[in-house]
Structure formats: structure tokens, C-alpha cells
Amino acid sequence: SLSFYKPILYKREKQKKHYGNDSRIIGWQLDNEPAVQFDYNPKAELAFRDFLREKYHHDIKALNDAWGTAFWSEVYSSFDEITLPKTAQMFMNHHQILDYRRFAASQTNDFLNEQCLLIKKYAKNQWVTTNYIPNYEEGHIGGSPALDFQSYTRYMVYGDNEGIGRRGYRVGNPLRIAFANDFFRPIQGTYGVMELQPGQVNWGSINPQPLPGAVRLWMWSVFAGG
């Protein structure tokens, strides 16, 4: 929510002033598994309109053409007429939904960038990253260029699939790490894994115990990916 934006940055600044030159700290992980959160309050609606004005260069005709609003008489005469895509009697304009998702992703990216730049203001020798969940359909991953490198989170066995092989239920599917490596490596070259399952979890409906040596195997798979 935009309502929390400034208070969080204020607290971040106080924190970085205190720890920015602490030699015991080598780097920072921003938040935990940042994701795109859909916000429908009035401030978000105003910000969405500003996002559209910038994207379409203040040309409402360009937006109408891109969204295909001539169909079903959706034509807008002003950006101020545009609302957030909430619900409709039959269906929503898919172009509007796509732009809203892009807007929400940009809000997440901007927030990460702001935090990162704030850290670097006081911590010249400390790197900054964050740990994304490798959801390949998400549009915000890799969209914060201020980060020094991108990182991901990976849980391999929590009862959601049988894995591969006779012991796969306790070792997992190696493609989960391989795909994540290949997804994150091209963004900046260097990538990290800030959260890798060390044992049983407390949130799985079925909770297999990783086989002895499984965590080491996963770590080697991360290193092998570059």
C-alpha cells in the first residue's frame, strides 16, 4: 500500500544510518519474497492513472487504441475516467488488467529501488539483494536495477509432488533448481539463493524429511548452475 511507503523508508533510513558502516555486515536482503500485491484504495487508483498518463504520453486516444475500447463502447475521454479493474457484470477489459498488473509490478520495483538507493547512501561497501520466489509468470522479477544481484528462494520437498526417482519424495525434482538458475542468471549474471530448505517446514500439509545429504545436493546444483 502506498500509505506505508514513506513510513517504511523513514525507518529504513534510521536503520541504515546506524548499521551502514558496521564492518560485521556484508550486505542486505530487502524484505522477504517480495511479490506483486494488488491495491484497490483511492490512492492506488490515482497512481494507476499517473502510470497510464506516462505510459501513453498523456494521449488518451493512444490508450483507447491500445485497449481496444471501441469494442463494447468503453472509449475514455480522459484519464480521470479510468478506474482500477475490480469487477464487471460480464468481463473486464484484458488490456486494462494487463496494464494494471504492470503498474502493480512497477510499484514493487520502485519500492525495492528506493530502499536499495537509501542503503547505498549510507552503506558504500555492502551489497543489496532480495529473495524472489521463482514464479515465472510474475512481471516484477528483475525490474529493480539498483540491486547488486538477484536472489531466489527454493523449497524442494513439502509434499506437493513426488519428485523424481524412488526417493524423489524426499529429494525433490532437480528441475526446480535448474529452471530457477536459468531464469535468474541472465538478469544480471550473478545471482544468489538466500533461502534454501534446510529441513522439514512448518507450513506443509504433508511434511517429508529431506534425505541425509539432500541439502548438500541442492547446494551443489545451485553452484553448478553458474
Regions from the language model: what does each represent?
Residues S1-F179:
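Polysaccharide-binding and catalytic clefts of secreted carbohydrate-active enzymes
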Residues I26, L196, I206, P210-G226:
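Substrate-binding cleft of secreted/luminal carbohydrate-active enzymes
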Residues Q37-D39, N202-S205:
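A generic structural signal for short coil/turn motifs at secondary-structure boundaries
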Residues L117, D182, W220:
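Surface-exposed charge patches
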Residues K120, R185, F223-A224:
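Anion (oxyanion) recognition and catalysis
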Residues S151-T153, N173-W203:
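Active-site core of glycosidic bond-cleaving carbohydrate-active enzymes
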